[in-house]
């Protein structure tokens, strides 16, 4: 694996408590909301996400930076019609991490 490359999280182990498979980085409410929104779209505009989640620019930026540093989110800043625009999307590792987190949540809340 190349230096600096991210590795996908290990698949959850079903023989241990589901809470141990929760992803602490994703589990924070704003970051979980970001991941859930991005999981349902190819890409999302920063302004749309800010309004959709009802958070401020700096708060959203801070959480996006944490997710980007983990390799979960791609932040693409472009100029369109002489205007800066920021597009956000999940990376393949981010998609896998989100699916694993959701699976752990489902196991955690399942009636036994």
Regions found by a protein language model. Give the residues of each.
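Beta-hairpin "wing" of winged helix-turn-helix
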Residues: 70-84
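Basic amphipathic alpha-helical segments that dock to polyanions
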Residues: 64-70
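N-terminal helix-turn-helix DNA-binding core of bacterial DNA-binding proteins
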Residues: 17-59, 80-82, 87-89
């Amino acid at each position: 694996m190349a230096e600096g490359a991210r590795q996908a999280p290990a698949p959850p182990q079903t023989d241990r408590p589901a809470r141990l498979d929760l992803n602490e980085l994703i589990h924070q409410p704003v970051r979980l909301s970001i991941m859930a929104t991005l999981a349902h779209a190819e890409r999302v505009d920063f302004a749309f996400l800010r309004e959709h989640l009802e958070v401020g620019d700096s708060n959203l930026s801070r959480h996006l930076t944490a997710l980007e540093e983990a390799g979960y989110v791609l932040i693409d800043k472009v100029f369109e019609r002489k205007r800066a625009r920021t597009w956000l999307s999940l990376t393949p590792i981010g998609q896998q991490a989100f699916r694993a987190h959701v699976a752990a949540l489902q196991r955690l809340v399942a009636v036994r």
